[in-house]
Amino acid sequence: MCSSVAAKLWFLTDRRIREDYPQKEILRALKAKCCEEELDFRAVVMDEVVLTIEQGNLGLRINGELITAYPQVVVVRVPTPWVQSDSDITVLRHLEKMGCRLMNRPQAILNCVNKFWTFQELAGHGVPLPDTFSYGGHENFAKMIDEAEVLEFPMVVKNTRGHRGKAVFLARDKHHLADLSHLIRHEAPYLFQKYVKESHGRDVRVIVVGGRVVGTMLRCSTDGRMQSNCSLGGVGMMCSLSEQGKQLAIQVSNILGMDVCGIDLLMKDDGSFCVCEANANVGFIAFDKACNLDVAGIIADYAASLLPSGRLTRRMSLLSVVSTASETSEPELGPPASTAVDNMSASSSSVDSDPESTERELLTKLPGGLFNMNQLLANEIKLLVD
């Protein structure tokens, strides 16, 4: 029976989004995983938490209950567009200071709260980015009309705190920018970005969990607009992706320090990619349907692997080795760097199969020559099979 008295694994979310598909699916998957592995589990809503510092020590109360056994891993889902450093991030920092392993960590979430902050983190690492300008002050949009002209028109204009494709414009010329300056809300700054014409109305959404690409989806606008977000009526379809594209998504995830993220890549005529955005609170309802994946289940598996349990650690270690062996034995999916991205096939198989299926399939073939090369690994595999 699953207990919440001394929970090892928590799911922490926000009341405003807890009924959304990703949160409900992650809760389902975590409950199932913890019951399967006989792990203690607790679901917590952000506004139930009271933070304490008593006698110089950090403490925690939930709905009046003094917490004495702290979670080892906390899966975090907070609405990044509305994240407040004085409340939400304070709770996450408190848990992290108490020794809890958060996924994602508070700094990783902050790296994605503001689109320009994301680019600041990625700059200097050799990551291909569209040229981008922003500004200080609260109402300096108008002064950027001249400053950003070097980016050439048309240019992309985005609210740095926007989400789901909202508050994104394609400015035709300086007059259009001037009109926008009178229409937009100025609570958050805007960024001005070089337009990648060849990727108009389409991009590639890559979901990365634990430093591994779990799947990729081509998103296309259906009404001619620049944004391809499924929440705005765009359609998503499973696609293959070149090794360059996969490695770029993993690199971005690593630089930003994210355990779970969605990376959006813009496509160029020469088959290369540049980064559009990174999402710490990635949605995956369209992704699950298009790619026939259970992203929540993959997240739950990874969360369990972070617990200090020998069996779980060996299991995910094996999964990593199996995945590497599988990837190196198959031909590269997606267009090579010299081929236009238009050749990406929406009917191709997914980049990475479901981790559980991959593991089960390969375990049935053991012992094989590859695994006999390492006796220690073979012993661990035998433990799992038994």
UniProtKB/Swiss-Prot annotation:
One of its GO terms (biological process) is protein modification process. Pfam families: RimK. Residues 338-352 have a biased composition (Low complexity). Residues 325-359 are annotated as: Disordered. Mn(2+) 2 binds at residues 277, 279. GO terms for cellular component: cytoplasm; cytosol. It is found in: Cytoplasm. Its main location: cytoplasm. Gene3D superfamilies: 3.40.50.20, ATP-grasp fold, A domain (3.30.1490.20), ATP-grasp fold, B domain (3.30.470.20). Keywords: ATP-binding, Cytoplasm, Ligase, Magnesium, Manganese, Metal-binding, Nucleotide-binding. The keyword Protein biosynthesis does not apply. GO terms for molecular function: ATP binding; citrate-L-glutamate ligase activity; metal ion binding; N-acetyl-L-aspartate-L-glutamate ligase activity. Mn(2+) 1 binds at residues 264, 277. Mg(2+) 2 binds at residues 277, 279. Its cofactor is Mg(2+); Mn(2+). InterPro entries: ATP-grasp, ATP-grasp_RimK-type, ATP_grasp_subdomain_1, Rp_bS6_RimK/Lys_biosynth_LsyX. Catalyzes the synthesis of beta-citryl-L-glutamate and N-acetyl-L-aspartyl-L-glutamate. Beta-citryl-L-glutamate is synthesized more efficiently than N-acetyl-L-aspartyl-L-glutamate. N-acetyl-L-aspartyl-L-glutamate (NAAG) is the most abundant dipeptide present in vertebrate central nervous system (CNS). Beta-citryl-L-glutamate, a structural analog of NAAG, is present in testis and immature brain. This is Beta-citrylglutamate synthase B. It comes from Homo sapiens (Human).
